[in-house]
């Protein structure tokens, strides 16, 4: 395997200009030229104003111009066309009585136990049972859900996001 090394270009601008000339698509009739000290703006590069919208762009080759004219013809024929779709069928109604939903499913998730009986939070050393409305870290009362109580028992003064939002709504945190 033979490797050839090309010398590094002396001027990056000249190198890019040469690459653009070598790789210029055939259907573009414009040439890259760096005239003046300021490069053309994006508006100048991409804002094409055609005198007649039906005439193909002078920058496109014959094949591209034909494809462009076919797309304009197809959109003109679709103007008066309306699509008739069937109406959406209504959702089936399910008869559910309130008696079929157990009451424990309607409780707030923050008050439901989130840990098993063997977990550290529900061990005999904890005094946390439910949501507390008073938050005073110096007194040592727990604030929030069982997960918050676990970290508060470890000495951290933190609560989870849901408990923070609930305390904020109740005006306990300012």
Swiss-Prot record:
The keyword Transcription regulation applies. It comes from the Viruses. One of its GO terms (cellular component) is host cell nucleus. The keyword Metal-binding applies. GO terms for biological process: regulation of DNA-templated transcription; symbiont-mediated perturbation of host cell cycle G1/S transition checkpoint; symbiont-mediated suppression of host innate immune response; symbiont-mediated suppression of host JAK-STAT cascade via inhibition of STAT1 activity; symbiont-mediated suppression of host type I interferon-mediated signaling pathway. A zinc finger (unnamed) spans 145-163. A motif (LXCXE motif, interaction with host RB1) lies at residues 106-110. Residues 40-48 are annotated as: Interaction with RB1 in competition with E2F1. Keywords: Activator, Early protein, G1/S host cell cycle checkpoint dysregulation by virus, Host nucleus, Host-virus interaction, Inhibition of host innate immune response by virus, Inhibition of host interferon signaling pathway by virus, Inhibition of host STAT1 by virus, Interferon antiviral system evasion, Metal-binding, Modulation of host cell cycle by virus, Transcription, Transcription regulation, Viral immunoevasion, Zinc, Zinc-finger. It is found in: Host nucleus. One of its GO terms (molecular function) is zinc ion binding. Belongs to the adenoviridae E1A protein family. Plays a role in viral genome replication by driving entry of quiescent cells into the cell cycle. Stimulation of progression from G1 to S phase allows the virus to efficiently use the cellular DNA replicating machinery to achieve viral genome replication. E1A protein has both transforming and trans-activating activities. Induces the disassembly of the E2F1 transcription factor from RB1 by direct competition for the same binding site on RB1, with subsequent transcriptional activation of E2F1-regulated S-phase genes and of the E2 region of the adenoviral genome. Interacts with host UBE2I; this interaction interferes with polySUMOylation. Interacts with host RB1; this interaction induces the aberrant dissociation of RB1-E2F1 complex thereby disrupting the activity of RB1 and activating E2F1-regulated genes. Interacts with host ATF7; the interaction enhances ATF7-mediated viral transactivation activity which requires the zinc binding domains of both proteins. This is Early E1A protein. It comes from Canine adenovirus serotype 1 (strain RI261).
